Amino acid sequence: MRYDVVIAGAGPTGLMLACELRLAGARTLVLERLAERVDFSKALGVHARTVELLDMRGLGRGFQAEAPKLRGGNFASLGVPLDFSSFDTRHPYALFVPQVRTETLLTGRALELGAELRRGHAVTALEQDADGVTVSVTGPEGPYEVECAYLVGCDGGGITVRKLLGIDFPGQDPHMFAVIADARFREELPHGEGMGPMRPYGVMRHDLRAWFAAFPLEPDVYRATVAFFDRPYADRRAPVTEEDVRAALTEVAGSDFGMHDVRWLSRLTDTSRQAERYRDGRVLLAGDACHIHLPAGGQGLNLGFQDAVNLGWKLGATIAGTAPPELLDTYEAERRPIAAGVLRNTRAQAVLIDPDPRYEGLRELMIELLHVPETNRYLAGLISALDVRYPMAGEHPLLGRRVPDLPLVTEDGTRQLSTYFHAARGVLLTLGCDQPLADEAAAWKDRVDLVAAEGVADPGSAVDGLTALLVRPDGYICWTAAPETGTDGLTDALRTWFGPPAM
């Protein structure tokens, strides 16, 4: 069987991409080198923009069930929470959702939609030509080959599709390394002054340029991290032992606090790298395969998730033959600068969490700035991805920005705009206007749904004064209309983002 798309990697990015591709009708195979799902969680939360996207695909309730809401974001553990409340969103918070649960929910959805998932199958080589990609795979029963139109590497920063392509991964080497343990502790952990709301327990050692921090994962289970900033770099892939963590805890905090019942051990660094390009012919990269960084502010999983939602509809339309030729190139053009911004802010956070006394003035200044509403909002927008704006033709300030989940007044009552995106199609929304939009957009009705609303239930929304919006499947506005503009530019926008009209 020839697949439309083969995805290497069954983490959150690969699984969400599989969901998006199946909604577009693409025959999709996911290959995961690990034979079994892991039972630990590297990432622990989803930010506001990711929650919005989950709502748009009908997955929001599953993620929000029993998930604590974190209403104050974290920047460099400076103790001043980021305020999401000024954004036009139904979700001014992050959700505490362990990655294991995220992957469980996304796996179930991908399989429900018809994606095929093979665990214990690793991509080992690839060859591509103008017609497709031949993927060499090693599975439990030996090597074999798979034919596909496109291959997407969502397999992380290690031995990956990116390396098989020979795509460079430039960036910055680490100046910090840490050991991590998810465990129980028999002794009371010290309360960490100045460690921030996300790290209520800890010890700061300016003399050692090191710190210990911990926060609760579940009753009596904590994630403990010990970080050093003046030690030789330790290979991130090197195994970590309980004794490594005990020794680090004792050196920095004076005790291992009776650590026991260890669930997970790992290490992290502030290595920061980004792929030189996200595409090579019929092979693309997404998630950690094209960007890695210090996991500060919980941005990594969300960055990859949003890569998947940006890429999925574009690749699906390309396979269906409805996309304009240049549509797939907009994936890298839009997402690479966003990832570069995340690398930039995590590099800044890496400096701010370094307990070197020389940086104390910088930390004090940053704390003062975080109390300035405009600065706080700017950083909250960065961390949550609520401020993302893609390059878009036109001058209206909403162009290229996410559409808020508006409560629409319709003939059937009030309905949230997000519910019209469950099928991952474009939406042409009219707001109480009599413009001949339906006739003009009729030739795209196989790709774009017309939603006629009388207006918005909440006054003072971001779309006040507009009579219509064209919104891409990923929720970003690509055309607007006002009474004075009529339908000017609608056909061009439809062609740009949804291809030529149907014959």
Swiss-Prot record:
Gene3D superfamilies: 3.40.30.120, FAD/NAD(P)-binding domain. Its cofactor is FAD. Belongs to the PheA/TfdB FAD monooxygenase family. SUPFAM superfamilies: FAD/NAD(P)-binding domain. Pfam families: FAD_binding_3, Rng_hyd_C. It catalyses: anhydrotetracycline + NADPH + O2 + H(+) = 5a,11a-dehydrotetracycline + NADP(+) + H2O. This is Anhydrotetracycline monooxygenase. One of its GO terms (biological process) is antibiotic biosynthetic process. The gene is otcC. InterPro entries: FAD-bd, FAD/NAD-bd_sf, RIFMO-like. Keywords: Antibiotic biosynthesis, FAD, Flavoprotein, NADP, Oxidoreductase.
